Curated annotation (Swiss-Prot):
Native source species: Prochlorococcus marinus (strain MIT 9515)
Function comment: May help in the organization of the PsaE and PsaF subunits.
GO biological-process terms attached to the record: photosynthesis
HAMAP family according to UniProt: PSI_PsaJ (MF_00522)
Coiled coil: none
Keywords: Membrane, Photosynthesis, Photosystem I, Thylakoid, Transmembrane, Transmembrane helix
Keyword Ribosomal protein: no
Domain of life the protein comes from: Bacteria
Protein name (record): Photosystem I reaction center subunit IX
InterPro entries per record: PSI_PsaJ, PSI_PsaJ_sf
Amino acid sequence: MFKIFNTKFMRSAPIVAAIWISLTAGIIIEFNRFFPDLLFHPMS
């Protein structure tokens, strides 16, 4: 089962970038769900 992660396809740049962007978006979405007003501060 872990042999699929040793292939060149899973370590290529588009796959790593898609996983990284999805993980970052998920972290931001969950942070915004639990703390809805801390992400964007008003300028006033």
